[in-house]
Amino acid sequence: EIAQCLVGSEMCIRDRMESLKNNGIKAKMLVRDKQTDQISVVRLKSNWLQVWKFMWERIVIWSANRFRRYHLFDVDIANTGTDITSLPEFRQADVIHLHWINQGMLSLNDIRKILTSGKPVVWTMHDMWPCTGICHYARECNNYQQECHDCPYIYKGGGRKDLSYRTFRKKQKLYSYAPIHFVTCSHWLKEQAQTSALFEGKSVTNIPNAINTNLFKPMNKKEARAKFMLPEGKKLVLFGSLKITDKRKGVDYLIGACKLLAEKHPEWKDSLGVVVFGNQSQQLQEQLPFHVYPLPYIKNEHEVVNIYNAVDLFAIPSLEENLPNMIMEAMACGVPCVGFNVGGIPEMIDHLHNGYVAQYKSSEDFANGIHWILTEPEYNELSAQACRKVLGNYSESIVAKKYTDVYNKITGKYA
């Protein structure tokens, strides 16, 4: 039996920990912010010093931006964190598995201590940060493929030896201490990582996120709508995000698509509605030509399952994505999705088979996708195919088996 210590954001790894435990892996999770009462989830000590560490990282970024808030929370430099190597959970583990460790959780120096402990390390990438200098998504910038500098996330493009350059060089040195087995959640992210100069000669495996298919599954649509007082006779499109107005979530393209649909299909004005859940969801009521049903951001997973089951389509106009859990959740509930051709989205949605992959940043094609799904005569088959895709690729047992293979491989190598 392998004892494992998972380190990172609880939201990213809680389901994965449960699936590993169900497959014979003894797992403990170290988190900064604990959201459950599970004893296998251990919260790192929280005090004024931890708050100061988080603030200090932001102050350094703020000063690099000439004391402007420019991209202040879009980058991380991991200059502060918590040393976990003396904790019993660390000492008892055979494998250390890092996940999303930013914003004051682990510093690069803390990771160096983990690497020099001699324990094998797996690091699941939830974005590009491990393979770039300071950014989580490089967008059009390719500097990380040779060496980060003149960073577009720094005010006026930084400079030749800016914060991105200095952090990139620190990561280069860090990765030389001991092997790290990197895991990406999508083929797209694996391709990006393998082009990085930081990952030259590094092991990278692609393993998708897992989903609890016993929880996320098709249910009675009429009953689901009744729980949120949604109308029975309308076609409903769902859009959701932690922060609705976040430009990266592409809400402007959804607004554009809906306006095009209203122009081309005026008969839809009374037969189509948009369910919006997330913080600031009310702001869309004045901007969409269809009736909007705003819901707050919901954390309770059982309620989230009901929301998916209440709608006919999930729209995700995001401009940056790895392997979005919300697509997985919607498809598991039998809800076809429309998303842009970006990141890992086209790996999840099979175009015209279980959903629609729209041309990047095209409101017109996004509108085409919404129209195609809502008018598809074989909608029930489309829905069934969405379910099958998740069951065949993202179920907990399938993903846990892939991770178990990685653990067995690296513990054997280090034995």
Feature map (PLM): residue ranges:
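Single conserved hydrophobic/aromatic residue that forms the stacking wall/gate
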Residues: E1-V7
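Conserved donor-binding/catalytic core segment of Leloir-type glycosyltransferases
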Residues: P231-K249, I255-K259
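Nucleotide-activated donor-binding/catalytic signature segment of Leloir-type glycosyltransferases, i.e.
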Residues: H265-S271, V276-V305
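Short alpha-helical donor nucleotide-sugar binding micro-motif in glycosyltransferases
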Residues: N306-V311
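Aromatic "clamp/platform" in nucleotide-sugar-dependent glycosyltransferases that forms part
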Residues: L319
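Short hydrophobic beta-strand element within catalytic cores of glycosyltransferases
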Residues: P336-G339
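Conserved acidic donor-binding segment of nucleotide-sugar-dependent glycosyltransferases
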Residues: H351-L352, Y356-S363, W372-P377
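A short, well-ordered alpha-helix in the C-terminal region of glycosyltransferases
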Residues: D365, E378-N393, K402-D405
